[in-house]
A protein has these predicted regions:
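ATP/Mg2+ or Mg2+-diphosphate-binding catalytic cores
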Residues: 305-350
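Active-site activation/catalytic loop segments of kinase-like enzymes and analogous catalytic loops
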Residues: 243-285, 301-318
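An alpha-helical support segment within catalytic cores of ATP-dependent transferases
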Residues: 8-19, 145, 166-209, 219-223
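Conserved NTP-binding catalytic cores of kinases and kinase-like/nucleotidyltransferase enzymes
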Residues: 1-91, 220, 349-350
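A cross-family kinase active-site recognition segment
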Residues: 119-178, 204
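A glycine-centered beta->alpha junction motif in the catalytic cores
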Residues: 105-119, 164-174, 301-319
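Active-site acidic catalytic loop and adjacent metal/ATP-binding pocket
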Residues: 32-42, 50-51, 87, 191-244
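ATP-binding pocket architecture of kinase catalytic cores
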Residues: 47-147
Length: 350
């Protein structure tokens, strides 16, 4: 979506929202990695509101996700996590959304931004992050029993992908026929594994998936460590196994650090620093053996769903082409060799 179209959509959304305050200036804050556009609206009373314009994916799943997000925020009120998730501006008792049939806009509270973690975390910070995310996951697990069931899952997403490359004569847009065979085989193997491990009966909690350092802030106390303060950006929010959060958490924990030029390599899942993260997480919210063994499959799901299936619609075109080509040439062919059993042993779960 280009800037002019996004600004027009945001202006129309603000008019429909019906707030009497006027927008004096719309300051773009987009990361320019995805096709979404994000703006900070400066209002005539000196306050600010965040607006996101998008045409990525399905509006109806977007609407469902934001209903769930709003419910999660309400359920976390009164807990340590009250105010952590940037709120969605409501109208008539529901999260407000503007939709014109082709694109959509949502308005968010401009939450206070605390300190950003450094691009490469110290080992104590990695361990602290493990404890903090574990605490957040526990709160989300408690809230999850009061949320409606989601309409999509890992299984349904992979069935949709497999249907799009269902025969040898059909290729994904932007990928060749041989690439389609790599995707088809990898998605089929994942679906077989989901069935074997009975993932439908695993606990499902609200998860955010994309834990890059630009999406959350922290506050440091007088002693060592920090507390997660605020979180924004919900592009990949879903209700699913907590294990889908861990690939990005391995990236944040990595010695590679948060980089402006990046790939979606699985190597971060097997660094000692991620094991330190897992140990700290496990002390607060114990993991099961099956969950840890699922980590390579969670990584495979990320690549298949967010890079291959949705990548052309979500990422900037030059990034989408590179990420998808890396996926089919390197990451998916090598995914079968990924083995989480050393992590299981290190956590004492063998």
């Amino acid at each position: 979506m280009d800037d002019a179209a996004a600004r027009g959509a945001v202006a129309a959304a603000w008019r429909e929202y019906g707030d009497r305050r006027a927008v004096r200036r719309a300051e773009e804050t987009s990361a320019h990695v995805s096709t979404n556009r994000v703006y900070r609206l400066h209002l005539d009373d000196g306050s600010t509101v965040m607006a996101k314009a998008s045409n990525y994916g399905s509006y109806f799943l977007f609407a469902e996700d934001h209903d769930r997000l709003s419910e999660v925020s309400s359920l976390l009120a009164g807990t340590r996590w009250s105010g952590f998730l940037a709120g969605i501006l409501p109208r008539d008792g529901r999260p407000f959304r503007w939709y014109d049939g082709t694109c959509w806009v949502v308005l968010y509270v401009d939450v206070p931004r605390g300190e950003s973690l450094p691009r490469t975390l110290s080992l104590p910070d990695v361990e602290c992050l493990g404890r903090e995310v574990a605490s957040f996951h526990l709160a989300c697990a408690e809230a999850s029993s009061r949320l409606p069931a989601p309409s999509h899952s890992m299984r349904s997403d992979m069935v949709a992908l497999l249907s799009s490359v269902g025969d040898a004569d059909r290729a994904l847009p932007g990928l060749g026929r041989d690439d389609g065979e790599v995707v088809r085989r990898s998605a089929h193997e994942l679906l077989v594994h989901l069935d074997r491990c009975d993932v439908d009966h695993w606990p499902k909690i609200p998860i955010l998936v994309d834990w890059n350092l630009g999406n959350f802030s922290v506050v440091r106390g007088d002693g060592a460590g920090f507390r997660l303060l605020t979180r924004w950006d919900y592009d990949w929010f879903r209700i699913d196994s907590r294990m889908l959060d861990f690939y990005f958490l391995s990236r944040v924990s990595s010695a590679t650090g948060d980089r402006t030029a990046f790939t979606y390599s699985p190597h971060t899942l097997f660094e000692e620093r991620f094991l330190a993260f897992l140990r700290s997480y496990h002390e607060v919210a114990p993991l099961t053996r099956d969950e840890v063994l699922f980590l390579p499959w969670a990584y495979r799901f990320f690549v298949l769903n967010y890079v291959v299936r949705d990548g052309r619609r979500f990422f900037r075109s030059d990034l989408a082409d590179r990420f998808r080509q890396e996926a089919v040439s390197t990451y998916l062919p090598g995914a079968g060799a990924l083995d989480a059993s050393p992590l299981v042993a290190a956590l004492g779960l063998d």
